[in-house]
Design a protein with these regions (language model features):
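Ligand-binding loop in jelly-roll beta-barrel domains
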Residues: 89-116
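Short acidic-glycine-tyrosine-enriched beta hairpin
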Residues: 72-91
């Protein structure tokens, strides 16, 4: 059984930071559960261009608000506490209007140290 807390992750290699965001990777590929699970926080005012080409992602909003724009269609979605979104490999931009706290699941699971590449994606996992 895996039992872990956010405090266990803080300031370890599973506590990953980027420009305006932070992800505490509670479950990763090496845990062997078939998905990864992170608590992700994004700063107010952050604008991120994302495109998860190699992963499926689902995010549940705990706190905060943002707008997600589907870059291929221009469709804008407003999200807040209780919202879930799953981009399905869509290119999207997230604009955070109040500090955002999310629970994010990725499949295939993240290894734990990923950061976004120039296209806003994570590279595929290698064995």
């Amino acid at each position: 059984m895996i039992v872990r807390t956010l405090d266990d992750i803080t300031d370890t290699e599973r506590d990953v930071r980027g420009d305006g965001w932070r992800a505490k990777r509670l479950l990763v590929r090496d845990d062997g559960v078939g998905f990864s699970l992170s608590e992700t926080t994004v700063d107010r005012g952050a604008k991120m261009h994302l495109w998860y080409k190699h992963h499926n992602e689902a995010c549940f909003v705990i706190d905060g608000e943002a707008e997600i724009t589907e870059r291929d269609t221009g469709t804008v979605h407003r999200i807040g506490p209780g919202s879930v979104y799953s981009p399905e490999h869509d290119r999207h931009t997230i604009r955070v209007t109040s500090p955002l706290r999310l629970v994010c699941v990725f499949n295939p699971p993240l290894t734990g140290r990923e950061t976004h590449d120039a296209e806003g994606s994570y590279l595929p996992a290698t064995d």
